[in-house]
């Protein structure tokens, strides 16, 4: 069971950082949309250009899809001792936002402007988890275990970014779905017997973080157990929880039907 839990944690953290699965980036009103490569690099395209990192993630390129020619935009400094790695979090207007992850879940965001050809650090301890239009779901760090963490909503402005909302202190799995935000929030334990992840509430709100509404709540089978939320959509909440007999089981809750079913592991 410990090995199973460790695997879940690793996959979940990778999904959030790289923008796959639970955190598919939406950019419906922006010119660029994203895809994930087999080696978990996020590439962005507007139909005529493609913005991407090379396989070693130390060079930023823009490729003209008509001519097939690629232009080197920026070389990226990589500190191998801190396991530093880059990923393109978002492309909005002329700005390319890059997340620089290092250490035990720390991260900074850098921005390259394709018009002015300038590159700078936008904000330290600032990780873009997901994006929609001019709004960003962010965190100050990304735990490498299953611990919840503070999540914020920022707005892209002409001067950089501006914080417009805080979703909560003990949150996870925040994502944009059809222009709305969905996220998991873990309330404080009611007594010493309950674990930090014993009870979870699922919320939705507007894209700017306002008008929060609780849509689902769930408790683990044991007070010292866990509930780990993997993905949230308009209809489905996918999670793994500790059952009464101490097993870790994955479930899907369908909000439309109100039914919960066990997910079979292949």
Predicted regions and their residues:
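Positively charged n-region of N-terminal signal peptides that target proteins for export
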Residues: 1-6
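Sec-dependent signal peptide cleavage junction
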Residues: 17-31
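Surface-exposed loop/turn elements that mediate protein-protein interactions on large endomembrane-trafficking
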Residues: 27-35, 56-77, 103-123, 145-167, ...
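Repeated scaffold domains used in trafficking and secretory/extracellular systems
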Residues: 35-45, 80-91, 123-134, 168-178, ...
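Residue position within the beta-strands of beta-propeller blades
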Residues: 52-53, 96-99, 136-139, 181-185, ...
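Short, conserved, GDST-rich strand-edge loop motifs in beta-rich repeat architectures
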Residues: 141-148, 185-197
